[in-house]
Amino acid sequence: MNTFTLLKTKFEHLKSRKLSSEDIREKNLQKFRKLVAFIQERSPWYKRIITKHRIDPYRCLPDDFPVMTKRDVIENFNEIVTDQTITREAISDFIESSKDPLDLFRNQYYVLHGSGTSGEIGYYLYSKDDFARGMAHGMGLVNFNLKIKRKRIAFLGATIGHFAGVTMVSTSMRSLPKLIFKTKTFEIHRPIHHIAEQMNAFKPDIIIGYATAIKILAEKQIEGMLNVKPSVVESCGEPLSPTDKEFIENTFECKLLNVYASTEFLYMGISKPEYGDMYLLEDDLIFELHSDHTCVTNLFNYTMPLIRYRMEDILIPVPEKDRILPFTKVKEVIGRREYTMFFTNKYGSDDFISPLDIDLFFIKDLRRFQIQLIDKQSFIFKALLNNGISEFQKNESLREIKSEIDSLLSAKDMENVSFEIEESKDLAVDPSTGKFPLVVRDNLKSVK
């Protein structure tokens, strides 16, 4: 990450706080047109769109472009990126071989991947400058009355691989941020009592993790297994209910930040106690809010431009007279909240597995999956594999799925939990939403 770009962008963000909402929209429009002029000559995908729709890069608006979907990104990756020497196949090989979140592809590009609501793996690239611009909002998030010292950050999540959360947090271990923070990552796939022991020894000032994981830590704090005194807790990766927010704040006796972030756009929104609700970070992002989805345009990523990219998050605007920030205020993000799976481990204790972590499995030909819970000691993993693969590739993918699940269960002391892997041609869809859940709970037998 380019430290100079990070500081320069943060300074620009601070100046933007003094602008009006109209000024920011105009500023973003100029950034957008600059981006379009850049990608017209470097991205075959966008060049075709610009030509087909007769778009003038110097007068265009975002809605001159069609909506982009994750499927578009997956199928047209090689033509979307502006460095035409990069291929999806090369990125896939890199992800398969590299597990350090701070490893750079060709020593130039940050690579992030995730599955998200579609269950399909998407790759997202950032140059060092792109990533620094996207990370600038992370500077100054914590501005509570903390004692002046090197702050200890504990991150609880998936830590082995190129996932957005651990990559964003791990940058605090490098360069300028490491002078301010001492960061330790805690693998969420470990048994909860191991996590608690290590966190007790670390004594974090700041705890960062999924909303569900943070809530479970709060429960362990009440039980006495965990004994920490953070000054700040930061929830990310999942919607945070008002009830859970109050429970976490009361348990840890500290204020809680709710950060809206994604693999595609990094920091997208922030909710602090003094804000009431959440502000979208519109310095370098353009949001289009709809009743059942949101489209976002990234103004800082020149390597993998995303214009009007559709996300399934629902953002509801909140009217406000006296704005603290010159951005759109929305209610807390309403998006996917998956069911956290609880199983009984080999010692007879209940422990959790977050489906969001299984959602980050990297299996080359695994297109989608769904977990059918049977009871607290068994489940079925339904795998939808890519079409057209050979019998050998199919068997290899199924073998890798079994290996990944075995490793996860072993790490959680759940070798006693049994599972079956079924190759499926289709997966169940929630009729009320039209989306397919990662975890299906029908016919459960006393699963928590």
Predicted regions and their residues:
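AMP-binding/adenylate-forming catalytic core of the ANL superfamily
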Residues: 207, 309-413
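Short, hinge-like loop/turn segments at secondary-structure boundaries
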Residues: 172, 224-227, 274-278
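Conserved AMP-binding/adenylate-forming
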Residues: 240-322
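AMP-binding/adenylate-forming
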Residues: 129-132, 152-213
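Residue-level signal for inorganic ion chemistry
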Residues: 39, 114, 153, 207, ...
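Adenylate-forming
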Residues: 187-194, 204-245, 258-264
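Short, structured coil segments at secondary-structure junctions
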Residues: 179, 229, 251-255
